[in-house]
Amino acid sequence: PGHSLMPATADNPEGYWEDAPLVGLDDALLRTLGLRWDSLPPPPSGWRTLPIVRRFAADAARVVAEEWGPARFAVVKDPRLCRLLPLWVDAFTAAGFDASCVLMARRPQEVAASLARRDQFAPEKSLALWCAHLVEAERDSRGLPRTFVAYDRLLAEPAATLDRLCRDASFPLQPDAEQ
């Protein structure tokens, strides 16, 4: 992650491990597109070519430079990336990074229960959001080195999962089973 992580909250005391400037930019772009993080419709067709999005592309490049600067690699976590991935792939590529994607999948019932607790969402909305995020991330990450990781597998077998993740997504890490 970058330098400016979102703080922990009462409903997530361990923290989100999400970069606040990136999340803020994603939320602002979604608002500009008439969406929110929990909107069911995808961004409009051709959203990347809209003139206003060019400003966000420049802001994304600035965020990458400020948060990751000369780092050899960057790890970014923000569920909004599922909807806005092309913008960030372009920003990281322009900064000299080779983009790879990890598509982390939690069981849909776990996601629905979590969103019901935190946001009082109906199970149907939560499941539809889960599906939309996963489908858009899969579509927009085609052509990039990527891997799919089951969240429960990561928790059960962290060393083996990280080893496979690094190999499949071409990450320059050699995970240490002791860490």
What are these regions, as identified by a protein language model?
Residues 1-57:
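PAPS-dependent sulfotransferase catalytic core
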Residues 38, 42-45, 53-175:
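PAPS-dependent sulfotransferase catalytic domain
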